[in-house]
């Protein structure tokens, strides 16, 4: 991506352009965010925008990668091994704190997830794929460490349990995100309710819901 000229400018100016750009794309789609609006808000000329990024698409994708990096930073958590749910929620709490700390970046990702422009569709899909992969890898590490408190049956594959719990948690999260897809930040106003839902669903999975003789 054409950004070497942008990397040469001062950190203060760079951060100002990044913040203004993210705010614009958190409010407008790729097509709706006209170049004239971008340069006006960022306080730079159209010539400088093209000098730094070559075109609007490169600027958009640079900002999207930047936002993803911010929202996936420092997600490693210390595992206590004493309480399964405390361990699982520790990484979710970190994600929640990052989302609260970077609301415009969160709104930008939400806008990007609904982007319909063919010009950036493939690149957005690739970036989001890497975002989910990175998040899931960190969640799986946390799950793997957390289930060490359980006395698993000898015939149970540890990795299979990790995969199953990861898929289950992901499905619960997606369910709740869909409820708040128009205003994703509202989810975190109901964060305790969200965690209680995860606790109930995971408890159902871990404890089972069939009588022991039902499968005989």
Labelled PLM ranges:
Residues 100-125, 175-184:
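Amphipathic alpha-helical segments used for helix-helix packing
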Residues 72-82, 86, 120-151, 159-163, ...:
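Amphipathic alpha-helical packing segments from all-alpha helical-bundle domains
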Residues 4, 9, 30, 36, ...:
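Gram-positive cell-envelope targeting signals
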Residues 12, 16-23, 27, 41, ...:
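Alpha-helical structural segments
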Residues 1-12, 213-216:
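N-terminal intrinsically disordered/low-complexity leader segments
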Residues 2, 16, 27-58, 62:
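Helix-turn-helix
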Residues 85-110, 159, 163-167, 195, ...:
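Amphipathic alpha-helical segments that line or abut small-molecule/effector binding pockets
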Residues 97, 137, 141-145, 167-216:
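C-terminal peripheral helix-coil segments that are non-catalytic and often amphipathic
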């Amino acid at each position: 991506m054409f950004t070497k000229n942008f990397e040469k400018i001062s950190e203060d100016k760079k951060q100002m352009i990044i913040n203004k750009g993210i705010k614009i794309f958190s409010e407008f789609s790729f097509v709706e965010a006209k170049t004239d609006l971008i340069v006006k808000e960022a306080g730079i000329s159209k010539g400088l925008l093209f000098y730094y990024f070559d075109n609007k698409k490169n600027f958009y994708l640079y900002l999207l990668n930047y936002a993803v990096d911010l929202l996936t930073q420092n997600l490693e958590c210390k595992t206590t091994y004493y309480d399964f749910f405390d361990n699982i929620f520790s990484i979710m709490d970190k994600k929640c704190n990052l989302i609260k700390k970077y609301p415009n970046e969160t709104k930008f990702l939400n806008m990007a997830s609904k982007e319909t422009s063919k010009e950036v569709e493939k690149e957005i899909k690739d970036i989001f794929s890497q975002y989910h992969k990175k998040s899931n890898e960190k969640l799986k590490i946390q799950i793997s460490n957390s289930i060490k408190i359980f006395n698993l049956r000898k015939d149970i594959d540890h990795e299979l349990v990790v995969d199953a719990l990861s898929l289950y948690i992901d499905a619960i999260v997606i369910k709740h995100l869909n409820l708040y897809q128009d205003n994703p930040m509202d989810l975190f106003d109901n964060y305790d309710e969200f965690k209680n839902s995860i606790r109930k669903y995971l408890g159902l999975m871990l404890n089972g819901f069939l009588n022991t003789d039902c499968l005989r």
